[in-house]
From Swiss-Prot:
Tissues where this protein is expressed: Expressed in shoots, roots and leaves.
Residue spans crossing the bilayer: 49-67, 80-100, 110-130, 142-162, 189-209, 217-237, 331-351, 368-388, 409-429, 454-474, 490-510, 534-554
Keywords for the protein's UniProt record, in alphabetical order: Membrane, Phosphoprotein, Transmembrane, Transmembrane helix, Transport
PROSITE patterns: PTR2_1
Membrane association type: Multi-pass membrane protein
Record organism: Arabidopsis thaliana (Mouse-ear cress)
Name the record gives this protein: Protein NRT1/ PTR FAMILY 5.15
GO MF entry, a single one: dipeptide transmembrane transporter activity
GO cellular component, one term: membrane
PANTHER family on file: OLIGOPEPTIDE TRANSPORTER-RELATED (PTHR11654)
Entry annotated with the keyword Ribonucleoprotein: no
Amino acid sequence: MKIPEEEVALLEDYVSDSVDHRGFPAGKSSTGGWRSAWFIIGVEVAERFAYFGIACNLITYLTGPLGQSTAKAAVNVNTWSGTASILPILGAFVADAYLGRYRTIVVASLIYILGLGLLTLSASLIIMGLSKQRNDASAKPSIWVNTLFFCSLYLVAIGQGGHKPCVQAFGADQFDAEDPKEVIARGSFFNWWFLSLSAGISISIIVVAYVQENVNWAFGFGIPCLFMVMALAIFLLGRKIYRYPKGHHEEVNSSNTFARIGRVFVIAFKNRKLRLEHSSLELDQGLLEDGQSEKRKDRLNFLAKAMISREGVEPCSGRDVDDAKALVRLIPIWITYVVSTIPYAQYITFFTKQGVTVDRRILPGVEIPAASLLSFVGVSILISVPLYERVFLPIARKITKKPFGITMLQRIGAGMVLSVFNMMLAALVESKRLKIAREHGLVDKPDVTVPMSIWWFVPQYLLLGMIDLFSMVGTQEFFYDQVPTELRSIGLSLSLSAMGLSSFLSGFLISLIDWATGKDGWFNSNLNRAHVDYFYWLLAAFTAIAFFAFLFISKMYVYRRLDQV
């Protein structure tokens, strides 16, 4: 029986697996798309403004009012940054299994605001305490004020851990994965998302860092708190036009996703001694082209044993096995990405400390805080994203004959190569800074400005923006796209957790090298006697090794969808 044209049009106007704020099927004309995505992008701009208002100058605060050594402060910053980047896994689990993305964002925002408020309070108490002891050069904040500061700092990490993976996944949810036009729009969403949040980061770095160093730290921490309140208000304004994943508006418990995928591994292990029938393999490979099936035959067939029917045990479905395989395939990619992102930890630690030692005048009489150098990352992204969208992708599409221009893995690999060159550049610039310090007899005068312009450091920050555009955005889109639909918050949290783990690895390397080389080694508190350039060469080598491993793994990777191959 032929379906009337009116009914076809009506069916096409709704998005499968999505509902509106009332729980009814989400209409394309009234919900989602760019109209709701811009609300969510606005939220992320405000959130990144708040986060980087704390992160960009944290090492200066730790070595200043808190009186920590450079090495200890770098480890503390890396530990906090790493924790903040790994917590999104927990936030994504809570969202995908229990609360849903919308509710998780609201709860996480409230925790975020509480943490920023307490951080402002602790900074006020520290300022008041130090002002009473201004004649004592060795004065440090009391233990309980220190404790309040670090507790509030980690409360911020918890808040952003719930906020970060859910906001981006919720934004991508606004585009219909079954509509070819909206799929391409979703790819653009990730690019413009990154450009917008980079604008927020750049403004934060310029404004907040200046306030912190030239007004006071309490006011400098209070501004991010105000912006986070604004972020929550903006998010709630768009409630009626959002598309919500269907599972979180019905009685369906998304934790079943974790259970069914976990069950694949359990049943496959129990069936490990059974022989796999050829029909099971065909079922598992049915959605792939012949070339891709051949590619898959020798790998992960162990998990297909979960589909074998056995007395007393219900077999897993082909979909469950495919979802489990998709997660397993991501692990090697994730590991190489973790190693390649260790250099990221340096731009809020050693890059900033190096900037403090040089001539920071950008114009006669105009001196900028060292942390403001981070704004050049945003400038690079603001220039690179439109060029990538309007110039690079059209050319790539003509060459490759593919709608996406280049694959997501090719995009990530390009970012890794740029990261190697960036660490080499950073090492050369630091070598020059040390040479100038020696030539002017400033090796033992750390408080005297090294006569080297801060503009020497700008290229490595501009290159960081390009690395973010290729590697970070590519990784976020890749993990979002390649995980099961119900676990997309988890997918995005995997890319974020890689950044977190790399921060921990960076902190571990710093502690290990500092212990091995002694107080006059690579990380001397007097940077004119240190050798941070050696550390940068080491990171360049690690990143190069990670890239070649990534290259080998990516050649064998099987995409979940044929249009990504």
